[in-house]
């Protein structure tokens, strides 16, 4: 049985080679893109709060000769103060795209955040050599009978809403998704901040739309990517792979611990509320072929100061926290 690395080096290489030989380089060749999630740039609060890690993520995209890069939300917490950091991504040496996460609007209005991310709206689509990428915005709250995007001045906190009312899609996103999938001539990839593999009403409705598109043309949608949960997880439902891309920095935990030295707590005031990683620029390079087959090449890192989760708290012994994005194929 081939390992994931062997698959990437052999099976996918053969598929890519065949595709490249059979088509012009700019038409039908596999699409390769860089993906990162949940960087949480917030100086003085979380490690790592310089631009060094982001520069390394961008450098990976350059070395891999990607067609574009996309970040899956929670990139930062203040789109005004973090504008230079955002622009380091926006102005990378390859095309870049952005997904809005729930924390991106913490200190700015939705309009201010979109302006910093160079977005007209939170949901949109784009095509690269026949592959369609569909971005959804999962940051609406259902408040007093209306869908309102979270952000400064919105009048509510998504963290105080019930589970059924937070991290919602706007109703207009469903017909948009139907049209985007229905008019695609090649494979489609769906991108969002939070997962669409769950059992909440919006996720179920998205999967119904995806299932209808795949019935009309089998294999139209093979992959969906998200962030939000700070973990590496692949779930396959009805022939579609839903991959949660891990954060390069940390996992938030709902209690404080005393596992890091005082100097760390003085530098980053919320480090005692997280399991911190070692700064490895965790990211993934995804290749999508014209027939919808894909391969994900991840990266592995370590824990901050070499301190494993169970050393921080016995409560974390069975959480499965790991600073890794594994390799996958489909």
Ranges and model annotations:
Residues 138, 191-196, 228, 299-300:
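Short, well-ordered beta-to-alpha junction loops that form the rim of enzyme active sites
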């Amino acid at each position: 049985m081939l390992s994931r690395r062997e698959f990437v080096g052999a099976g996918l290489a053969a598929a890519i080679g065949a595709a490249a030989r059979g088509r012009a380089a700019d038409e039908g060749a596999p699409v390769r893109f860089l993906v990162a999630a949940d960087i949480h740039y917030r100086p003085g609060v979380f490690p790592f709060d310089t631009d060094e890690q982001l520069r390394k993520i961008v450098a990976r995209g350059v070395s891999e000769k990607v067609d574009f890069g996309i970040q899956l939300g929670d990139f930062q917490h203040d789109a005004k103060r973090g504008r230079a950091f955002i622009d380091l991504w926006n102005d990378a040496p390859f095309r870049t795209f952005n997904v809005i996460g729930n924390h991106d609007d913490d200190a700015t209005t939705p309009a201010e955040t979109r302006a910093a991310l160079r977005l007209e709206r939170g949901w949109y689509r784009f095509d690269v050599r026949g592959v369609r990428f569909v971005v959804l915005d999962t940051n609406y709250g259902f408040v007093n009978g209306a869908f309102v995007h979270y952000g400064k001045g919105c009048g509510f906190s998504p963290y105080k809403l019930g589970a059924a009312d937070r991290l919602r899609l706007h109703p207009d996103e469903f017909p948009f998704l139907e049209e985007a999938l229905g008019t695609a001539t090649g494979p489609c990839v769906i991108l969002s901040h939070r997962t669409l593999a769950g059992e909440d009403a919006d996720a179920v409705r998205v999967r119904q739309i995806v299932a209808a598109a795949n019935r009309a043309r089998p294999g139209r949608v093979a992959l969906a990517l998200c962030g939000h949960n700070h973990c590496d997880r692949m779930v396959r439902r009805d022939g579609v792979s839903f991959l949660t891309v891990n954060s390069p920095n940390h996992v938030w935990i709902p209690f404080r611990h005393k596992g890091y030295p005082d100097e760390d707590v003085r530098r980053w005031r919320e480090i005692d509320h997280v399991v911190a990683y070692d700064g490895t620029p965790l990211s993934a390079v995804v290749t999508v072929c014209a027939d919808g087959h894909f391969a994900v090449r991840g990266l592995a890192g370590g824990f901050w100061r070499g301190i494993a989760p169970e050393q921080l708290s016995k409560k974390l012994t069975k959480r499965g926290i790991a600073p890794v994005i594994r390799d996958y194929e489909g």
